[in-house]
Amino acid sequence: MIHPTAIIHRNVFLANDVEIGPFCIIGSDHGPLGLGPGTIVRSHSIIEGGNVIGPGLETGHHILIRTGNEIGTNLRIGTMSRLEGGGKIGDYVRIHGDCEMTKGELRHFSRLYGGSYVTDNRLPPSHVNENAILDEGAVVTMNCVVIAGVRVGVGSFVGASTVVTRDVPDATALVNGKMKPVTELRWKDIEYPWPRNFRDYPAEAQPRLEALHKRIIDLLQ
């Protein structure tokens, strides 16, 4: 269903079951845009043309996706979040509300929590732009900044309000400026590695999720 107040550009191709909410702008003169089966775009959102987007995209309200991104299957992106151009996003990635990413890479099953920013420019600013990477199954929690050129490893975890200025190795937690194996973190009802404990993935993702879980366990050996 396409809300009558939505603006759909002439270069846009929509699957039959796509839902577009009120006051959205879909497409632009930057190039063609296709939105596949299962896509839901909520109100006041803007998705520019020239993006490659897999099926099952689901957005919050007031999101912005600029041109030049490559986005995999079943991205969920929360209210007020922004993807600037040139980003790469894998399958089953979760971006919560009020996040921003510029030319970064979020690999399969990675998660970026509210208020976090993935940058493409080191501090102090320079003419060199480098992609930051969240590897498969990586979790960056609330109000973090991942500096350009940094990699957060497979199955790794970054605690809230952290500025990540150096690589976080695979299966490692960065909390209060200190690194340790993710298995040393314990909260009620949660055991690491992370991916198996999240429940918001469709059934078809489960075999890949289990393979990632096994990979993280092997990294901890």
Segment roles from a protein language model:
Residues M1, I7, V12-F13, E19, ...:
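Glycine-rich hexapeptide-repeat left-handed beta-helix
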Residues H3, H9, A15, G36, ...:
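Residue-level recognition of the GNAT/N-acetyltransferase active site
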Residues P32, V41, I47, L64-I65, ...:
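Extracellular beta-strand scaffolds
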Residues V41-R42, V140:
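Extracellular beta-strand-rich, repetitive "passenger/adhesive" scaffolds
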Residues E48, P55-G56, G60-T67:
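Glycine/small-residue-rich loop that forms an oxyanion/phosphate-binding "nest" at active or ligand-binding sites
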